[in-house]
């Protein structure tokens, strides 16, 4: 592998930090607000890289991928990375529209370069388009099944390319750097990011109409007045206090075994009504009197037994029992 010149070293010093920012965006380790200063710095660095690449004439329009030196292959990713950085730059809706347009231009330029180098052979959708409006209005609508199939195929291809990239990197770490393996790694990365750009361009096309509508409403608020809030009449609930057993039973129910079904008064009125004549009459007064006399006799016997027990305790003190062999 040939040694790097001073110009290539300065290129690499600007390119590598920007590539690190792209890796952090892909990994999702940092939040988007934390990455904003680094994204802006990465855009500035890659713009300088673009100027240096043009001054050094690393690429020409009449060559194929086999003619590009191995050391120059990574810089084919510069427009792709610029598109990713502009896409992730946080701005107001009006400025975001411009950032997405720049991102779209960079990503298309990246795919155009790969097609000119014959690295990809598929026909690009925008080759026959003249303006962005024509792209948004006259773009043929694909069926849902077709969109799903294309997404699955692209995702599968990305996974295969990512696995191939990891495999080549392990080979480069295990042995000394071989130019053939290094070139294969760069080609694999270019193919991976080409699939990624297809996905991001579709996402940008879906987002642009929404941002245009938001920007138009922000610039002409009187044309799009905000709809009045929907007023829904809600019936007012009157406060109430449970003061009677009937209301309490309506709330708590009657089936819980620990709560009585009715009060004594309710049971009495339900059973006998308000007529005292319906109350149960004693059918055997004589029996009641006999029971009372028996209770009195029992009380007299119990009283006499208690008196006899007291007299016994007076005559027989505690511990006076059998004193045999007690000294």
Swiss-Prot record:
One of its GO terms (biological process) is regulation of signal transduction. Disulfide bonds: none annotated. Residues 141-185 form a coiled coil. Keywords: Coiled coil, Meiosis. InterPro entries: TAP42/TAP46-like_sf, TAP46-like. The keyword Coiled coil applies. Residues 302-318 have a biased composition (Basic and acidic residues). Disruption phenotype: RNAi-mediated knockdown causes 94 percent embryonic lethality when injected compared to 20 percent when fed. Partially rescues embryonic lethality in gain of function mei-1 (ct46) mutant background. GO terms for cellular component: cytosol. It holds the Pfam family TAP42. Residues 291-301 have a biased composition (Acidic residues). The keyword Coiled coil applies. GO terms for molecular function: protein phosphatase 2A binding; protein phosphatase regulator activity. Serine/threonine-protein phosphatase 4 (PP4) occurs in different assemblies of the catalytic and one or more regulatory subunits. The catalytic subunit is likely to be pph-4.1. Probable regulatory subunit of serine/threonine-protein phosphatase PP4 which may play a role in meiosis and embryonic mitosis. Probably in association with catalytic subunit pph-4.1, regulates microtubule severing during oocyte meiosis II by dephosphorylating and likely activating mei-1, a component of the katanin microtubule severing complex. PANTHER family: IMMUNOGLOBULIN-BINDING PROTEIN 1. This is Serine/threonine-protein phosphatase 4 regulatory subunit ppfr-4. The gene is ppfr-4.
């Amino acid at each position: 592998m040939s040694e790097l010149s001073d110009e290539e070293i300065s290129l690499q010093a600007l390119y590598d930090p920007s590539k690190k920012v792209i890796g952090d965006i892909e990994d999702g380790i940092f939040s988007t607000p934390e990455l904003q200063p680094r994204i802006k710095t990465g855009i500035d660095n890659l713009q300088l890289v673009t100027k240096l690449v043009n001054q050094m004439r690393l690429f020409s329009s009449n060559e194929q991928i086999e003619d590009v030196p191995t050391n120059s292959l990574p810089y084919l990713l510069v427009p792709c990375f610029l598109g990713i950085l502009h896409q992730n730059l946080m701005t107001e809706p009006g400025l975001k529209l411009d950032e997405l347009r720049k991102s779209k231009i960079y990503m298309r330029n990246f795919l155009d370069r790969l097609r000119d180098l014959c690295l990809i052979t598929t026909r690009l959708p925008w080759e026959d388009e003249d303006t962005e409006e024509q792209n948004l209005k006259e773009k043929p609508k694909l069926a849902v099944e077709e969109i799903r199939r294309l997404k699955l195929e692209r995702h599968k291809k990305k996974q295969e390319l990512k696995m191939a990239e990891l495999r080549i990197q392990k080979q480069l770490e295990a042995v000394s750097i071989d130019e053939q393996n290094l070139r294969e790694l760069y080609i694999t990365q270019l193919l991976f990011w080409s699939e990624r750009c297809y996905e991001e361009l579709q996402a940008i096309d879906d987002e642009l109409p929404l941002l245009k509508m938001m920007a138009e409403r922000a610039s002409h608020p009187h044309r799009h007045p905000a709809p009045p809030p929907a007023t829904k009449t809600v019936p007012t609930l009157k406060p109430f206090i449970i003061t009677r057993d009937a209301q309490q039973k309506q709330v708590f129910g009657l089936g819980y075994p620990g709560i009585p079904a009715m009060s004594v008064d309710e049971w009495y009125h339900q059973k006998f009504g308000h007529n005292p004549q319906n109350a149960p009459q004693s059918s055997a007064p004589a029996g009641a009197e006999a029971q009372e006399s028996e209770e009195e006799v029992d009380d007299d016997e119990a009283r006499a037994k208690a008196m006899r027990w007291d007299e016994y305790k007076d005559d027989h003190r505690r511990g006076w029992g059998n004193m045999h062999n007690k000294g």
